[in-house]
Amino acid sequence: MKITCTDLVYVFILLFLNTSCVQAVFSDDAFITDWQLANLGPWEKVIPDSRDRNRVLILSNPTETSCLVSSFNVSSGQILFRNVLPFTIDEIQLDSNDHNAMVCVNSSSNHWQKYDLHDWFLLEEGVDNAPSTTILPQSSYLNDQVSIKNNELHILDEQSKLAEWKLELPQGFNKVEYFHREDPLALVLNVNDTQYMGFSANGTELIPVWQRDEWLTNVVDYAVLDVFDSRDVELNKDMKAELDSNSLWNAYWLRLTTNWNRLINLLKENQFSPGRVFTKLLALDAKDTTVSDLKFGFAKILIVLTHDGFIGGLDMVNKGQLIWKLDLEIDQGVKMFWTDKNHDELVVFSHDGHYLTIEVTKDQPIIKSRSPLSERKTVDSVIRLNEHDHQYLIKFEDKDHLLFKLNPGKNTDVPIVANNHSSSHIFVTEHDTNGIYGYIIENDTVKQTWKKAVNSKEKMVAYSKRETTNLNTLGITLGDKSVLYKYLYPNLAAYLIANEEHHTITFNLIDTITGEILITQEHKDSPDFRFPMDIVFGEYWVVYSYFSSEPVPEQKLVVVELYESLTPDERLSNSSDNFSYDPLTGHINKPQFQTKQFIFPEIIKTMSISKTTDDITTKAIVMELENGQITYIPKLLLNARGKPAEEMAKDKKKEFMATPYTPVIPINDNFIITHFRNLLPGSDSQLISIPTNLESTSIICDLGLDVFCTRITPSGQFDLMSPTFEKGKLLITIFVLLVITYFIRPSVSNKKLKSQWLIK
């Protein structure tokens, strides 16, 4: 077809309309989708700062092995800084020679540290021979300054001892935590043990200024509750009503009348103005993301269980806002599980041998039942055996086990020992620092089948079972179109053993059914056991981290990839080759593997694997660093088959997502998901990943002393447009294009007719 000048003009007009009417702006979500709840823990001691009356030093022991020291502004309720000490403080006193210096002592180890009271700089430390100190007073104020009478708190005048300020005590008042009357006056009350309220003077009145609740410290378990759009529920009801109709005509008439009523309601809401209706349909408020949060699965409630026996719901799209909180009145929380598919009920196990069933509602959950286990022992751990049969394996601190079955029906929340023995076998693997143990549950009895114990000079430092994922591909397609088949045997676990005598780290891959070790790999580069070690097990690969001293001190990352065979197109698990997986009879092929070691510039504390709905998105290794930051690395960078760029063959470069081997992996600033936040994860923190309705997006949360959540997109946000995308201009552009097409269509038809008759 011949192109004329007129056609070119039309093309330029279309391009102009496209560029002028459509503007897609993609903005950074930093500090918009992520949030942090910083905690101090229950206040053990409050120490005034002599150089600033508005500042105090707060000591708390959130864990059994560490102490948290925080500088706090009592006038504004703002946290100024926090510092975790690697030991608990038994004594804290002022230096006799310098009252601006604080001496912290651990009596069991005689370890002491001397800090500047104002900015908490470490001045001196040692073992034994601590500096001479002055004992701190038990209270932060004099007893004759405050009195409590008839449910009122009176602040007394220093000379007349008459009440200068009066305050009605809040419900649940426990004690006066801190008080000073110098300008400005500051008063802190402790309420319900975990709540702290700050007051200041406004004339003759005491007014509340700030409030904190420290119940969230030390999260031990979590559950996620999806929030659904009420309109989806209404739509489901309409569809069910249509399906229940007697005939096709009745179903059609029901849909027609329902949609007509919706149209009338829409017109009423907009005062029967077509212009308002059209504007509402085109408008898209970039700040209002309620609908998109519901649609894309961002709207979730994070339910957390704390060590001190509190359970609470946090709104994940509203910066972790507390929706509800419930005191379970137990000594310690251990584990909790959903008891039904609809997520209407939770069961919580406590450390003292009780279990509670909790009905979860939107407003305030209620405790339905509270019962002791059949064996009144201290609970160490709880494992869910079967999601549908509500069976749990409870391990006590004396190593005994209890098989527990819960009937989630109404008024029957009691433990039941099944009378009908199941013919199926359930295999369970447990581990501790002394070894790994295999059990079989048969006929409602628990029997140990195998045991892998370590010797006295060894310790198991990390353990991970193979992650259950959606299987998308059986193998890796190479550059020459051949396939390396993944080793997808599900009953696998990987663990690390530290040998203090020989200064080695040993990686083992074990079959959890038989206890057979399939792969072992030893590292003799002088691992430093003072630093943390961790391991994660993905679909067909394992990644573990440790710190070594040779040849130079550095953090190591090791990846191990498992294949059925390292020979392309060789698949040993094909049923046509008369091969079957049966580990109990010894019919199992050991995996062949490739491994690579990388250097990482920061010390890694814990690791986790990103999860998405269908597991299509590239997996990311999410890492919590020792410095309090959280970052992630796409798994494709940790390639065990990678070679240096100069050694890569031509076919290897054609492989999808192939990356050359680089021994040092730098930290990408764009992948630091905590940004400049001061995050205190704690010694037993959990790094978790929660899938959303968007395949590209995963929610990452760190649960410990603090709670932090954000979203990551390891493969980019390929399935979501920005809220600022200008939908109205796009529709106008399409409309203008249709109009132009309508008017130029006769001209094009006329040209075609003339060309057939050879008319110029």
From Swiss-Prot:
InterPro entries: EMC1 (IPR026895), EMC1_C (IPR011678). Residues 25-723 are lumenal. Keywords: Endoplasmic reticulum, Glycoprotein, Membrane, Signal, Transmembrane, Transmembrane helix. The keyword Cytoplasm does not apply. It comes from the Eukaryota. GO terms for cellular component: EMC complex; endoplasmic reticulum. N-glycosylated. Residues 1-24 form the signal peptide. Residues 745-760 are cytoplasmic. Its main location: endoplasmic reticulum. GO terms for biological process: phospholipid metabolic process; phospholipid transport; protein folding in endoplasmic reticulum; protein insertion into ER membrane by stop-transfer membrane-anchor sequence. The chain crosses the membrane at residues 724-744. It is a single-pass type I membrane protein. Glycans are attached at residues 73, 106, 192, 202, 420, 443, 574, 578. It is found in: Endoplasmic reticulum membrane. Part of the endoplasmic reticulum membrane protein complex (EMC) that enables the energy-independent insertion into endoplasmic reticulum membranes of newly synthesized membrane proteins. Preferentially accommodates proteins with transmembrane domains that are weakly hydrophobic or contain destabilizing features such as charged and aromatic residues. Involved in the cotranslational insertion of multi-pass membrane proteins in which stop-transfer membrane-anchor sequences become ER membrane spanning helices. Belongs to the EMC1 family. Component of the ER membrane protein complex (EMC), which is composed of EMC1, EMC2, EMC3, EMC4, EMC5 and EMC6. Present with 2840 molecules/cell in log phase SD medium. This is ER membrane protein complex subunit 1. The lineage of its organism: Eukaryota, Fungi, Dikarya, Ascomycota, Saccharomycotina. The gene is EMC1.
